[in-house]
């Protein structure tokens, strides 16, 4: 199958999660929500490094997302990075300095930008590949929610009645 018919939808949903929702309506986030990247920009390295009772941190969530998107980006250029992927590595980087936090956010921003380009580009895919593409959006939404449970400074606006 070809993604031409669903590329605009995939791009809209991923972009909303990463870059924020328009004030006049949204599909996943509340209207006017700033999205993942600007939410992370609100945090200091110290806040991003705060460990949860389970041993993770927002810094680790951000690195995990960066790693997963780097795999998707490599796949989109014809590689098969999944056979040798080591997801556990991204969870080991729980604490960051100020410079490491700036770098981690910049790297995540770059991977999200590359993946948006890939989502916009129609391609022939197998069912398993389409599942991975759609799964990448759900995966990012899950981690955005987890990050927002860890630190309320990252939370978006409450839904207002219309």
Regions found by a protein language model. Give the residues of each.
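Short, contiguous alpha-helical
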Residues: 2-19, 23-33, 37-40, 45-89, ...
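Acidic/histidine-rich alpha-helical segments that form the ligand environment
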Residues: 91-141
């Amino acid at each position: 199958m070809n993604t031409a018919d669903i590329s605009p939808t995939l791009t809209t949903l991923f972009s909303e999660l990463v870059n924020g929702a328009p004030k006049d309506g949204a599909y996943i986030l509340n209207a006017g929500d700033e999205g993942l990247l600007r939410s992370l920009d609100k945090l200091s390295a110290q806040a991003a490094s705060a460990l949860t009772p389970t041993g993770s941190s927002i810094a680790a969530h951000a690195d995990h997302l960066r790693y997963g998107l780097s795999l998707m980006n490599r796949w989109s250029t014809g590689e098969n990075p999944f056979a040798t992927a080591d997801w556990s590595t991204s969870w080991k980087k729980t604490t960051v300095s100020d410079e490491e936090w700036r770098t981690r956010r910049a790297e995540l921003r770059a991977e999200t930008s590359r993946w948006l380009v890939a989502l916009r580009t129609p391609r022939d895919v197998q069912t398993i590949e389409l599942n991975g593409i759609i799964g990448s959006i759900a995966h990012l939404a899950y981690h955005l929610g987890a990050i927002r449970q860890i630190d309320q400074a990252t939370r978006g606006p409450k839904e207002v009645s219309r």
